[in-house]
Amino acid sequence: LKALGATDVLSLSAVGGLRADLPPGTFVVVDQFIDRTFAREKSFFGAGCVAHVSMAHPVCPRLGDHVQATLAGLGVPLVRGGTYLAMEGPQFSTLAESRMYRSWNCDVIGMTNMPEAKLAREAELCYASVSMVTDFDCWHPAHDAVTVDAIIRVLLGNADRARSLVTALTAPITTDP
């Protein structure tokens, strides 16, 4: 992306909510990540080249602010800030894992965003992530454990809002003749 001239990267992800106040349908503009993945390439560097990139603030505040303002303008229920737990998958969490992630104060859980957030930082790209809550993972006693059917049902409901977000964010972009 950097080689093609991209400066900003927006990620849209389906996630499980790890807090009762993040019901399905909520969009979360996350600002932190915990990487629990293990089977993915995690760096552009290697083969004798070492680089240490700070991940203290993995989300670009400028893009995060723009995303938040755009979602608010579209009337989408949103929360600004939160911690995204990236798990390897493809299996969903066990109840014990879900409880542990909640005890870590994670807000949402998903299988994407890592290594993307780290790679964007390495490439010096402005990165932001919108997590679209589709379920309560398996921790919530009043809700069934997550299923693919439930995720797809909520995602279909979020699709128009996600398209509206991307359209609104990219509308000001122009190309040089």
Task: Name the predicted role of every residue range.
Residues L1-W139, A145, D149-L156, D160, ...:
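Glycine-rich phosphate- or other oxyanion-binding loops that anchor nucleotides, phosphorylated ligands
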